Amino acid sequence: MNIFILDSWLREHLQTKATPKQIGEYLSLCSQSVEKVTKIEDDWLYEIEITTNRPDCLSVYGLARELAVILPRFGLPAKLKSLEISQPVKTPDKKNLPLEVKIKDASLCPRFTAVIFDKVVIKPSPKIIQERLEKSGIRALNNVVDISNYLMLELGQPMHTFDYDKIKGAKMILRESAGGEKITTLDDQIRPLPDGTIIIEDGEGRIIDLCGIMGGKNSEVDEKTKKVLLFVQTYDPVRIRQACQKLAFRTEAASRFEKGVDPEGVLIAMGKAMEMFEKNCEAEIASQLIDIYPNPPQEKKVKLDINLVNKIMGIEISKKEIVNILESLGFVLETNQSSLMTVTVPHWRYDDISIPEDLIEEIARIYGYHRLPTNLPPMAVVSQNKIDFPKWEAKIKTALKFWGFTETVNYSMVSESILKNVEIKPEECLRIANPLSDEWVFLRPSLVPSLLQVASLNKKENLKIFELANVYLFQSENQLPEENLMLTGLVSGESFAKVKGVVESLLEELGIKEIEIKPYQLQKTFYGKIFHPSRRAEIIFKNNSLGIFGQLKKEKVFVFDLDFTQIVKDTNEIKKYQAIPKYPPIIEDLSFVIPEKTYVGEIMKAIKTTSLIIQRVELIDSFEDSRTFRVTYQDTKKTLTDEEVEKIRNKIIKGLKDKLKIQLKS
């Protein structure tokens, strides 16, 4: 996530003489990546990419806190200024507007604070606030809304304001949404609420807030507002993230809440907001401060061994320097004479620091990754042949392109209906925990459903398409899914023999010859269900299955589904030179009457193995129970005589009759 902050705003919290260029360079070296430092009039604007695990840096103050530690490591004095709140959080003496708050599940909202202001004057914010918001990428609206956005950028604490008079019954109930509920948000969008979304309803049951994401239109602050309810809180990050994913909608506030907001910083932000309301809105505090904080987090302690620090960093770093680095970052240390120490984590890092390695990462980045030695760790080098997958992918794609195929690229996710169309059980597939929509719920276990969907949208004769991509196979609850790279093609308007020829030619292109085509017998599998029972086959090479091809049951569409990883393992780049034969071949066609359930592959194999003189066997015609094979005879040492060919022919006829009960057609 990228944020934009002004140099002048940063220096309100950081006392230093470092230049903007130095700040950008050293912050990038030891903490967050500064993408750009841009001169804007008499100021500088930083564009900073904040890593997901560091929500404490999603604010001006958080970055100032980081820089106060980092800059002195480069010889640049820096000091973090204390957060001063001139007006402490207090309650009014006379006026006390009522507000009833009920939180149905404390885990939804770990900390809830609220206060009401009266006699609010709605007007534009001071110029400096407007400029800082606009240059940080947030539109200035009015003094009330701008306060919440301003403090979100400055302190990293999102907050929300309501028109108090629009909250019916002066009552707020924070709960999870139920099925079928909707809210009209501040952007005038009607949003159906997924089950389990955190919401707030008022005394009449109207939903007035899509918590952590955007407020409701029915409680917004407008130019007529006189009483404002300020609401500063934290939420369960997981619930906010899930809601954003299901709604396909995310705001600046949600981007912070879903990463985790420090509940200990809520009162600081509330105090700062109360001060700004009195100053910028001429408002009076008109209620008691509500602070619901039932389960404050327990103090987090992590054991750290200095020997482990040195082992992982690969250098000897003194105990004194380790202590100095960690204390400068806000950690509290309990040390003794041994190498062990107990480290108490500061509240703003509770979600980030859990194990000794987290602390070592902190030590390493402040010490300076650029100062660590670049020696490679000792290891045994094992020589192995690495398969060049991109090369073979390019080779296969080029071959298919020249044969008239078009490559398709489909989503890896499919819907339940697409799976059921090809008789794949959804419960046997990998379900995505947080799908983007109902159309993308499962990771596909095969490329076939995707290609069939493409074919249904492209109704035409002689369609030839293919896809080379991963499929994901569910194993068991205790095993990781299996990920396979598959090559799948779809052909319409052709014959079984031609599709078989494509598969054989493709494998020959990769140096895989003498494959065995066997009937596919597994009826209960996915392939057994979608393919025609007598027009499907399995490709075997060296006792390994390379894939399946066949005709679909319901229409004249052929599919081949090949295990690309296994194919590449069997590829052979070595091409043997074969001299052009000196002696001519003899070619003849033999027609046979074939009994039912006799496979052509068996016949061709029987013919080919009859004699070494037989160089090639092809099926050239098929009609009812008759098959015609073209047999090529050739001797590399002499010209064959008719008598020699006749002898081999008779041997073929006898062998087929004895083994397969096949008769020569008269």
PLM ranges: what are they?
Residues 1-389, 493, 516, 563, ...:
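RNA/tRNA-interacting regions in translation and RNA-turnover enzymes
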Residues 172-221, 371-483, 487, 545-546, ...:
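Class II aminoacyl-tRNA synthetase-like tRNA-binding/catalytic domains
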